Amino acid sequence: MAKKSLIEREKKRQKLEKKYQDFRHSIKKKIKETSSLDEKWEFQKQLQALPRNSAPTRLHRRCFLTGRPRANYRDFGLSRHVLREMAHACFLPGVTKSSW
């Protein structure tokens, strides 16, 4: 189980990313559209003035149940440990153990 403080920190980052998402997207679009280096420089300054945690690259996928930050399956939102346990307990419909 991950520390609750780390899980809360990740939630805070998700809120910030959602809050500044449209503004960040519009600035990046303006940077691509302008040809003047001075204007690009000003837009880049605006982009750098945004909070660091509002960048989407700062987000990290975590397990829905345990909060584990590594070895997550996107399809289920679970870590490999929880996925294995739930698959063996038949809590995930359609998931079968492979056999060849």
Swiss-Prot record:
Its main location: plastid. Pfam families: Ribosomal_S14. Binds 16S rRNA, required for the assembly of 30S particles. The keyword Coiled coil does not apply. RNA editing decreases as the tissue ages. It is found in: Plastid, Chloroplast. Keywords: Chloroplast, Plastid, Ribonucleoprotein, Ribosomal protein, RNA-binding, rRNA-binding. Belongs to the universal ribosomal protein uS14 family. GO terms for molecular function: rRNA binding; structural constituent of ribosome. Part of the 30S ribosomal subunit. GO terms for cellular component: chloroplast; small ribosomal subunit. PANTHER family: 30S RIBOSOMAL PROTEIN S14, SMALL RIBOSOMAL SUBUNIT PROTEIN US14M. InterPro entries: Ribosomal_uS14 (IPR001209), Ribosomal_uS14_bac/plastid (IPR023036), Ribosomal_uS14_CS (IPR018271). GO terms for biological process: translation. This is Small ribosomal subunit protein uS14c. The gene is rps14. It comes from the Eukaryota.
